[in-house]
């Protein structure tokens, strides 16, 4: 069986790594929420050897993630745990959380559930990095993002590029503060939240 492959995971991974390495420099453990194909995990983990990188996703995606991990093993890269945002997370506390290209795919109630889970499981002063496209003041940042949003909504009416203001409000309501908003290539962003306290 061929491994799953996502071009979106290959795009910008070097730029994402640079931002993550800075944000996660003081962390020891990271949970990747929605590891998808597993491509980000096998690239990021060996390039941040001080981290224990825990992959996770719904059970249907575990086989593909495991195929990537088998082909590109790393001592600090852990096999996926089942994480469904509709249910409690199967972890205790963790230093850092990363998710990419997820918040515009999942429904808004699941976006809310994501931030609730982050707040519950992230250690004090821990970092949460969120990669993907966002709108600012209700406006698309590019024509390509506008077209992408139309495609998303045609595919699933609950999907959409999220407004940064709504994301920040969700985060603030659960004790997370936006520390950085990094511009990424191809009209994407990397948002860095820190748990207050």
PLM region spans:
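Class I SAM-dependent methyltransferase Rossmann-like catalytic core
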Residues: 1-25
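Conserved Class I S-adenosyl-L-methionine
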Residues: 141-165
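A short acidic, Gly/Pro-enriched loop at the edge of an enzyme's catalytic core
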Residues: 89-97
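Conserved beta-strand signature within the Rossmann-like core of class I S-adenosyl-L-methionine
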Residues: 125-137
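Core SAM-dependent methyltransferase catalytic element
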Residues: 176-197
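Conserved glycine-rich SAM-binding loop
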Residues: 36
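A short, conserved alpha-helix within the catalytic core of class I
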Residues: 106-118
């Amino acid at each position: 069986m061929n491994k799953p492959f996502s071009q979106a995971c290959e795009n910008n991974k070097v730029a994402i790594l640079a931002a993550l390495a800075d944000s996660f420099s003081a962390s020891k453990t990271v949970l990747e929420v929605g590891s998808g194909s597993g491509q980000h995990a096998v690239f990021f983990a060996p390039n941040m050897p001080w981290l224990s990188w825990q992959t996770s996703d719904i059970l249907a995606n575990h086989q593909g993630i495991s195929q990537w991990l088998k082909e590109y093993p790393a001592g600090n890269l852990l096999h996926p745990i089942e994480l469904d945002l509709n249910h409690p997370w199967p972890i205790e506390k963790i230093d850092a959380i990363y998710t990419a290209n997820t918040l515009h795919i999942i429904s808004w109630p699941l976006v809310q559930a994501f931030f609730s889970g982050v707040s519950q499981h992230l250690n004090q002063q821990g970092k949460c990095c969120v990669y993907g496209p966002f709108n600012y003041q209700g406006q698309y940042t590019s024509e390509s993002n506008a077209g992408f949003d139309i495609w998303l909504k045609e595919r699933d009416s609950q999907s959409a590029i999220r407004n940064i203001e709504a994301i920040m409000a969700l985060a603030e309501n659960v004790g997370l503060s936006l520390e950085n908003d990094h511009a990424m290539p191809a009209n994407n962003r990397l948002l860095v939240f820190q748990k207050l306290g």
